[in-house]
């Protein structure tokens, strides 16, 4: 409006200079008559990549880039990952006992963590574009994979990895495929018609390796994916070096060696072979502990 004339605009990301679903943001700022734009980050998208800044400067707008860059990069990590690495940012969530178990030997797991931690998981889900599980978890747990208890919110996409799509067509995921987005990533030869008839979107990849799976999800527009299990999928993501953030909810009980581990075999023979995450934040949650870890860029899989 008129009050923008001569004002300073603060933006997280460089205003775009191309026509997408809306006209270029740089043009809108020029038309509004702002005198100065303070931008935390340049936009690495090849369609922008400095063009927005140059267009505003050519129009006589003073442009400053950099203030708040670290926080902006943290907040925009998913977008930056999809542009720079051609895959979404991956968060791995684990909820386990102090000795790394997710269930007793008999399979009992409800509930290891308390209600405060479980509510926090729903907030974590809401901060991601998609929730991802393996086919084994989908078959064993019949999960809904949704956000509950936080009001009427836009539900994340539910992603299930299953080479042959041998998933129950009468399960909760199938029954709600028309209401909450369900994406199925599968291998060659899987029968997709029954799932597509239910409203699911199917993606074929040569193999259920994290690299092609995440590339397909990134190409489909996802920027932030939260993996919630099971142990085999979690281990495969860690082995591939594609876990960017690791969030572990730990309860104050021990289940022993006979309990079910939160991870499958990682193939680690020497300490130097294990990815070493950096602690970002620890939060006490009414008797449980939430620890957030980040993988330094030099520890990730090159090119992934």
Role assignments for model-derived ranges:
Residues 16, 56, 100, 134, ...:
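Residue-level signal for inorganic ion chemistry
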Residues 1-71, 157, 183, 188, ...:
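Zn2+-dependent cytidine deaminase-like catalytic core
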Residues 41-45, 68, 163-165, 187-189, ...:
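Short, acidic/turn-prone active-site loops that include or flank metal/cofactor-
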Residues 2, 81-223, 232-235, 299, ...:
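Active-site ligand-binding patch in enzyme domains
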Residues 36-37, 130, 224, 244-245:
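Residues at the N-termini of beta-strands
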């Amino acid at each position: 409006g008129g009050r923008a004339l001569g004002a300073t605009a603060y933006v997280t990301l460089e205003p775009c200079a191309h026509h997408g679903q809306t006209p270029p943001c740089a043009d809108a700022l020029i038309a509004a008559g702002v005198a100065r734009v303070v931008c935390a980050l340049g936009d690495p998208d090849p369609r922008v990549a400095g063009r927005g800044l140059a267009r505003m400067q050519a129009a006589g707008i003073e442009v400053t880039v950099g203030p708040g860059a670290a926080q902006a990069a943290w907040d925009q990590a998913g977008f930056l990952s999809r542009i720079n690495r051609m895959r979404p940012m991956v968060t791995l969530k684990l909820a386990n006992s102090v000795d790394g178990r997710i269930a007793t030997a008999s399979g009992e797991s409800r509930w290891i963590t308390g209600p405060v931690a479980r509510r926090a998981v729903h907030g974590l889900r809401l901060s991601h574009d998609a929730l991802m599980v393996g086919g084994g978890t989908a078959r064993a747990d019949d999960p809904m994979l949704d956000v509950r208890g936080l009001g009427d919110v836009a539900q994340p996409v539910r992603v299930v990895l299953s080479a042959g799509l041998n998933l129950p067509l009468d399960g909760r995921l199938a029954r709600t495929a028309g209401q909450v987005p369900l994406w199925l990533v599968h291998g060659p030869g899987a029968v997709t018609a029954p799932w597509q008839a239910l409203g699911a979107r199917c993606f074929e990849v040569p193999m259920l390796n994290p690299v092609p799976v995440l590339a397909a999800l990134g190409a489909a527009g996802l920027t932030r994916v939260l993996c919630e299990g099971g142990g085999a999928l979690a281990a495969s993501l860690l082995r591939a070096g594609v876990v960017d953030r690791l969030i572990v909810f730990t309860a104050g009980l021990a289940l022993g060696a006979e309990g079910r581990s939160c991870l499958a075999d990682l193939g680690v023979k020497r300490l130097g072979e294990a990815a070493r995450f950096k602690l970002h934040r620890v939060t006490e949650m009414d008797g449980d502990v939430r620890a957030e870890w980040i993988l330094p860029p030099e520890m990730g899989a090159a090119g992934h």
